[in-house]
């Protein structure tokens, strides 16, 4: 098959903002660490700051009936008019004639990559747990069964699922028709397989582990994910089958003697990958699996993933992390704008997940790399207060690409599809690490799986969400669909649906708890 497990398509900043919240109730508990500095996880988060003026001016329950009706109308519209085969894409024209994910989508295509089917399904599932409305559980179940029908034989998912007979024949799905010669690369890129499993695990829990299709899909996916973990604890970006453990020695990270001037390995998705938080998302997902199923093997695999991060910390003078490593544990090329270098964004997410692992295990070695890494990264902050996405190996000079992909130290002609500067979250990371060392860490990560009271939304946010919903149950907004083939001025976004459903359901959960 010609489809690349890591397509060279356009990326937006949303891909660096959009995970975590789709993991459902339990996964959202990680917010204390994993959303430091707003972190890399923010699809639909409803953590608005309280609006003291609006709440002082009126009773917090004043929008109760309106919120319940708006939530019902919005979910019903998405589940009955927007969904295809129970699944969703990213963006729709207001009249639903055009659909797209990261690329154009047909009437029989749904998207897995956030904010696609798992993200929408998880928001609806949270709404069910917060309100008890059976209609929402049915919509979430359909989204889950849609994902189950798109699971590849390799155990995970690629970015989209096809449902037309002709298109399905190009993939090796586990469900019929099965094509053993079809595309069978599962991807951990952009939180794709991880988000599907997180949602399906939460759905499995809510359904009491009684839906055979959902439960078996999760168990198969988790089993295959454990099987493709390398001996060193890393995962590839994409996988079809387990690696031969004898072919991949366990090594610590070192600097290469020479850096190839351009990408020099065709199937770079086999490399040990931290890029776009792939490794860290996988660890978080396995910690959730350990909580939901009580299986030590998932915790063990997550810890092994953490041990890889200890191995992957570069030696001085740059004790942080690269986006990807080759099998000699040297920072390596991926795409032509993802080079062997220290990565400012991924390094911060490594620090977050190491703290999460410490919370789950109490293992001091997961905190040990943090002071050196933070000290180094603080010394590398740019004049504008941010961090560079890439720092040149050994020299530590910031690296950028021009719009025509020439490597440079100058930041004046950057492409717009990729963030070459990232937010500096080091102060928050330092504070959290100190609290953990003082045993002041939150205990929520050790709680039992299940719904917990979400952050309380402000009345002004609730009012805004209600007022912007139209009579059909749509949140229509200005926007462009570049793949529609013609100008589209008004769109419906799954990202907006997720955010607004979370606000309404969180508000109703607070009213129920009063």
Language-model-detected regions and their locations in the chain:
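Short amphipathic alpha-helical segments enriched in leucine
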Residues: 18, 75-79, 83, 125
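C-terminal segment of N-terminal export signals and the immediately downstream linker at the start
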Residues: 7-8, 28-58
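Substrate-binding/active-site clefts of carbohydrate-active enzymes
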Residues: 312
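Terminal, non-catalytic domain-edge segments
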Residues: 49-77, 195-220, 262-264, 284, ...
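Extended ligand-binding groove/face enriched in aromatic
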Residues: 82-280, 299, 315-338, 384-419
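A structural motif
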Residues: 276-279, 343-347
């Amino acid at each position: 098959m010609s489809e690349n497990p890591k397509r060279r398509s356009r990326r937006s900043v949303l891909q660096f903002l959009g995970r975590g919240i789709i993991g459902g109730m339990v996964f959202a508990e990680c917010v204390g660490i994993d959303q430091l500095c707003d972190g890399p996880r923010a699809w639909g988060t409803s953590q608005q700051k309280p609006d003291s003026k609006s709440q002082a001016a009126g009773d917090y329950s004043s929008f109760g009936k309106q919120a319940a009706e708006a939530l019902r109308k919005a979910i019903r519209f998405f589940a009955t008019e927007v969904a295809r085969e129970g699944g969703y894409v990213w963006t729709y024209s207001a009249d639903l004639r055009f659909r797209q994910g990261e690329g154009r989508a047909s009437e029989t295509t749904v998207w897995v990559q956030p904010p696609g089917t798992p993200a929408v399904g998880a928001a609806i599932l949270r709404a069910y747990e917060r309100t008890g409305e059976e209609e929402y559980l049915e919509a979430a179940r359909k989204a889950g069964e849609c994902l189950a029908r798109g699971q590849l034989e390799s155990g995970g998912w690629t970015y989209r699922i096809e449902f037309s007979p002709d298109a399905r024949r190009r993939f090796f799905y586990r469900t019929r028709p099965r094509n053993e010669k079809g595309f069978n690369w599962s991807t951990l890129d952009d939180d794709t397989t991880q988000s599907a499993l997180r949602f399906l695990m939460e759905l499995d829990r809510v359904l009491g582990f009684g839906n055979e299709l959902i439960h078996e899909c999760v168990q198969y996916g988790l089993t295959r994910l454990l099987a493709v973990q390398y001996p060193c604890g890393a995962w590839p970006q994409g996988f079809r089958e387990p690696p031969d453990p004898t072919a991949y020695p366990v090594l610590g990270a070192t600097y290469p003697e020479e850096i190839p001037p351009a990408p020099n390995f065709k199937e770079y998705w086999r490399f040990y990958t931290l890029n776009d938080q792939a490794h860290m998302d996988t660890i978080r997902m396995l910690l959730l699996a350990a909580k939901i199923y009580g299986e030590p093997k998932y915790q063990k695999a997550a810890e092994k993933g953490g041990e890889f991060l200890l191995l992957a910390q570069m030696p001085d003078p740059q004790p942080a992390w690269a986006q990807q490593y080759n099998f000699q544990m040297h920072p390596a090329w991926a795409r032509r704008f993802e080079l062997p270098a220290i990565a400012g964004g991924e390094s911060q997410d490594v620090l977050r997940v190491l703290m999460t692992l410490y919370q789950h295990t109490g293992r001091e070695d997961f905190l040990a790399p943090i002071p050196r890494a933070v000290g180094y990264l603080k010394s590398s902050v740019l004049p504008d207060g941010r961090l560079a996405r890439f720092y040149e190996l050994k020299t530590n000079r910031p690296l950028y690409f021009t719009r025509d992909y020439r490597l440079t130290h100058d930041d004046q002609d950057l492409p717009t599809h990729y963030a070459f500067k990232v937010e500096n979250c080091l102060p928050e990371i330092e504070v959290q690490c100190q609290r953990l060392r003082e045993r002041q860490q939150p205990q929520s990560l050790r709680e039992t799986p299940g719904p917990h009271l979400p952050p309380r939304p402000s009345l002004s946010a609730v009012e805004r969400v209600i007022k912007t919903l139209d009579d059909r149950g749509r949140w229509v907004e200005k926007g462009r669909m570049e793949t529609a083939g013609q100008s589209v001025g008004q769109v419906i976004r799954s990202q907006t649906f997720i955010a607004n459903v979370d606000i309404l359901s969180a508000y109703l959960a607070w009213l129920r708890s009063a």
